[in-house]
């Protein structure tokens, strides 16, 4: 009897899963009114370091290549 009940519960859970297909729950993204988790200065520093190191690497490869 317990096995039949367990199978019935699994079938109900599965059928709920099928009928709700395509209904995606809301994401955990910030609402439009909330602030970003990274400040503008930290973002600017990160971009400066990444772009600066890329430019430095390009200049160094040009010097060594010629």
UniProtKB/Swiss-Prot annotation:
Membrane disposition: Single-pass membrane protein
Major subcellular site: membrane
GO biological process: endoplasmic reticulum unfolded protein response
Keyword Lyase: no
Entry GO CC: cytoplasmic microtubule; endoplasmic reticulum membrane
Transmembrane parts of this sequence: 39-59
Keyword Metal-binding annotated: no
Compartments (UniProt record): Membrane; Endoplasmic reticulum membrane
Coiled coil regions, renumbered to chain: none
UniProt keyword terms in alphabetical order: Endoplasmic reticulum, Membrane, Transmembrane, Transmembrane helix, Unfolded protein response
Extracellular topology ranges: 60-66
Comp. bias intervals (Polar residues): 17-30
Cytoplasmic face of the membrane: 1-38
Region of interest (Disordered), residue spans: 1-33
Chain's role: Interacts with target proteins during their translocation into the lumen of the endoplasmic reticulum. Protects unfolded target proteins against degradation during ER stress. May facilitate glycosylation of target proteins after termination of ER stress. May modulate the use of N-glycosylation sites on target proteins.
Homology family: Belongs to the RAMP4 family.
PANTHER family named among the record's database cross-references: STRESS ASSOCIATED ENDOPLASMIC RETICULUM PROTEIN SERP1/RAMP4 (PTHR15601), STRESS-ASSOCIATED ENDOPLASMIC RETICULUM PROTEIN 1 (PTHR15601:SF14)
Subunit structure: Interacts with SEC61B, SEC61A1 and the SEC61 complex. Interacts with CANX.
Descriptive protein name: Stress-associated endoplasmic reticulum protein 1
Organism: Pongo abelii (Sumatran orangutan)
């Amino acid at each position: 009897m317990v096995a039949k009940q367990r199978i019935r519960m699994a079938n109900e859970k599965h059928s709920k899963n099928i009928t709700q297909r395509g209904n995606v729950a809301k994401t955990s993204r910030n609402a439009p009114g909330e602030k970003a988790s990274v400040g503008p200065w930290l973002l600017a520093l990160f971009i400066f370091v990444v772009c600066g190191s890329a430019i430095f690497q390009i200049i160094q490869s040009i010097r060594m290549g010629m």
